[in-house]
Swiss-Prot record:
The family this protein is said to belong to: Belongs to the UPF0161 family.
Subcellular location, record wording: Cell inner membrane
Recorded topology in the membrane: Peripheral membrane protein
Species, as recorded: Rhodopseudomonas palustris (strain HaA2)
Key word Nuclease present: no
Keywords: Cell inner membrane, Cell membrane, Membrane
Protein name: Putative membrane protein insertion efficiency factor
Length: 121
């Protein structure tokens, strides 16, 4: 019984630490199955902004993934970017929890480089 208590406490702490991440992903799920289902997909990127947000928050947590998603939403407009824009595999260099804007890519996309030089923004 005593060996079960530390494991249970660790499981509880792990579940509590995932709560913000799951709440953010839950909001995206609600958006996808309500408003987005009625209006349809109008995103200029692949993956869509809601898919990007779900993946970013799932991978990096609500704080960092939320900032990445905010920057993506700002870029997704008629005068913004378009094309392939995947969630980065690792946090960008210089990103710290107290400098949250550094998690986000505010310009450009990270699609495959075609060698033309315009992806170096």
């Amino acid at each position: 019984m005593h060996s079960r208590l530390p494991t249970h406490a660790a499981d509880l702490l792990q579940a509590l630490s995932r709560l913000p991440r799951n709440a953010g992903r839950g909001l995206i799920w609600v958006y996808r199955h309500s408003f987005s289902a009625l209006v349809g997909s109008n995103c200029r990127h692949l993956p869509t902004c809601s898919q990007y947000g779900d993946e970013a928050i799932g991978r990096f947590g609500l704080w960092a993934g939320g900032w990445m998603t905010l920057a993506r939403l700002i870029r997704c407009n008629p005068y913004g970017t378009s094309g392939i824009d995947n969630v980065p595999e690792t946090p960008p260099p210089g990103a710290r929890w107290y400098l949250p804007w550094r998690y986000a890519r505010w310009r450009g996309v990270n699609g495959p480089d075609c060698g033309c030089g315009h992806h170096d923004e």
